[in-house]
């Protein structure tokens, strides 16, 4: 039952991150289709100096991609549990699955931060407030979407290795208990 649940969670993680990737790419397309202002006309009507209009579609898809990415990241971290190595001694005793779990956890956070921040910059650039008007608006959604895909793969690998490490820790604890009982 645990292995079936683990497989299901991994599939959900990957599918949700693929969906976030698609949303990021669609947001990039919607942003590129947004009408551009002619600089001279726009500068007469507004002091902001923005050369393009924000895209409502890109904004909505960017928000949806960020929400989905956040939910997947929280889900994987809660279900995967807290996997850590505190000392050199812990590292020497750690199984391969535990070392992999820690490595994938770190990579998962890196992918999350990069994808979330690039999606956020792209989304804010398409908000009605135009606070990020001076930033170049190209490729933020695409980069965020690509990193969402990487996040899905790395986070799924983290979840699988964390569950395997927990199972190994539980089996090792049972064997130690049996060994201690037989000595007594």
Swiss-Prot record:
Residues 34-53 are annotated as: Disordered. GO terms for biological process: determination of bilateral symmetry; leaf development. GO terms for cellular component: endoplasmic reticulum membrane. It is a multi-pass membrane protein. It comes from the Eukaryota. Mainly expressed in roots, inflorescences and developing leaves, and, at low levels, in mature leaves. Disruption phenotype: No visible phenotype. The vcc-3 deal3-1 double mutant shows leaf asymmetry. The vcc-3 deal2-1 deal3-1 triple mutant shows a strong leaf asymmetry. Keywords: Developmental protein, Endoplasmic reticulum, Glycoprotein, Membrane, Signal, Transmembrane, Transmembrane helix. It holds the Pfam family DUF1218. InterPro entries: DEAL/Modifying_wall_lignin1/2, DESIGUAL. Its main location: endoplasmic reticulum. Disulfide bonds: none annotated. The chain crosses the membrane at residues 62-82, 99-119, 140-160. It is found in: Endoplasmic reticulum membrane. Glycans are attached at residue 180. Residues 34-45 have a biased composition (Basic residues). Residues 1-24 form the signal peptide. Belongs to the DESIGUAL family. PANTHER family: OS07G0462200 PROTEIN-RELATED. Involved, partially redundantly with VCC/DEAL1 and DEAL2, to ensure bilateral symmetry development and early leaf margin patterning, probably via the regulation of auxin and CUC2 distribution. This is Protein DESIGUAL 3. It comes from Arabidopsis thaliana.
């Amino acid at each position: 039952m645990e292995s079936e649940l683990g497989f299901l969670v991994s599939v959900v993680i990957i599918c949700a991150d693929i969906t976030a990737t698609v949303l990021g790419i669609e947001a990039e397309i919607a942003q590129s289709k947004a009408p551009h202002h002619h600089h001279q006309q726009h500068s007469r009507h507004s002091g902001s100096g923005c050369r393009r209009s924000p895209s409502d579609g890109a904004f909505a898809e960017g928000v949806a991609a960020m929400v989905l990415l956040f939910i997947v990241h929280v889900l994987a971290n809660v279900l995967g549990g807290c996997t850590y190595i505190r000392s050199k001694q812990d590292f020497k005793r750690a199984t391969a699955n535990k070392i992999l779990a820690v490595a994938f956890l770190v990579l998962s956070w890196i992918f999350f931060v990069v994808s979330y921040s690039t999606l956020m910059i792209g989304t804010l650039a398409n908000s009605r407030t135009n606070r990020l008007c001076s930033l170049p608006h190209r490729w933020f959604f695409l980069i965020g979407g690509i990193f969402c895909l990487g996040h899905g793969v790395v986070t799924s690998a983290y979840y699988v290795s964390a569950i395997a490490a927990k199972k190994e820790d539980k089996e090792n604890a049972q064997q130690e208990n049996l060994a201690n009982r037989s000595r007594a």
